[in-house]
């Protein structure tokens, strides 16, 4: 059954393809589609990143030491791994010894464990993993080591006051493109090093920057043309063995990151296999990269199985809080890294804010995901009873135990008047017969660089009759097949919503598949409703 309200922007029924596409661009507010799709000249001067000149000077001083060694301290997510790989490959290309250190689980920032072993490095470069206090940085200085920080998170007042001494280069500090990811900042740093040192290395590392931008859900909309241009360059210049091993092609698109690379890294984080995810981007051997992809795929399947088992318990927990506007789920600490995945599944299923936490010394900590709310993080942070860090409706959360009951009461009071049925904005309303190869080509061009602030093209098709219901992969996936098109939902489990005979109305992304020489139009359904065919009783 339909889970959302649909708001269609363009009724394209009866229109030729070019008119449909023109109306689409108008609805998205894009005045010059050609320069938007193929951006050139939008890379901002690296000098606009504060402290980049000082950081580069520190880098060069260390590089010119006898037998220099750098340690790169990486965040655990795809943006962090990409950032580390950019620096690692740059350093090895100029013949400098480099080692990458990565945290365990989903930890962020320099941790005490880093100091248990002296690696005899001259310089520590922290990428995409900034701390909230000076304590760890002072330890690095106390050991006589130089420090550089490349980041994109908003620093707090203490860090901001010390930005110059920290050699902090961040897109979050007065930079015209605050949406630039950690990998984007790192790429611009090595691009700057190319400029001042007369090398030419960074352009063949831009694919890593593109991966980080898409994976970290940074804007690729008209408000960040620099990000779009980095993706434009990176998608067409695949040099990294790990990226090529995943996408198995000479070029990639945003979907390659969102549905392939990102999920593999995320699964490794949740299953405490961060080093393997990092190695995917560090290796320069394609055969090794292919084996890592196989290993990561196996880890992802293990994660999926474990999450499914845990999610079964959520059904019971919901029975005790059905009248709540926000659902709470407690998991064992050993499964804490799965909190984000489980919260996503829960909010998608029950269409409301969902909080998944485990018991920690700080209190109840974990993840929240929300739908039907403009900014759930702001609601949490305004309570004074808990704290969110992350995006508006996708963030980490900490609630002191002594505040938990009061926190729940406060959240409930803030959500009382809200309708949690999400509004799905649909780009185009079309008939099935309008899904031609020419239209699909245009849609693919648009979707090549898509993501935050510029989502892929969505289409509504209604009144689909004479279909056949198929269960794919032993009932894991739904396929509604008509003579000219397939409508698909991956990992489907709501079979009670399926009607064998009726009328289907669907919203989703359109594409085409090729199998045994046959081309088939398809839609990956984001939302749908089956309207049963009324039964007619004969009267005589």
Name each model feature, range by range:
Residues 403-408, 471, 500-540:
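OB-fold single-stranded nucleic acid-binding module
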Residues 483-498:
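Beta-strand/loop nucleic-acid-binding surfaces
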Residues 417, 421-423:
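Non-transmembrane, aqueous-exposed alpha-helical and coiled segments at domain scale
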Residues 428-485:
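Accessory interdomain/linker segments of ATP-dependent helicases and helicase-like nucleic-acid enzymes
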Residues 2-123, 141-145, 194-412, 423, ...:
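Hydrophobic helix-and-loop "lid/oligomerization" segment in the mid-to-C-terminal part
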Residues 1, 186-188, 373, 535-540:
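Nucleic-acid-binding small beta-barrel platforms of the OB/S1 family
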Residues 158-215:
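Short alpha-helices
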Residues 86-94, 100-183:
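Hydrophobic, small-residue-rich alpha-helical packing segments that form membrane-like cores
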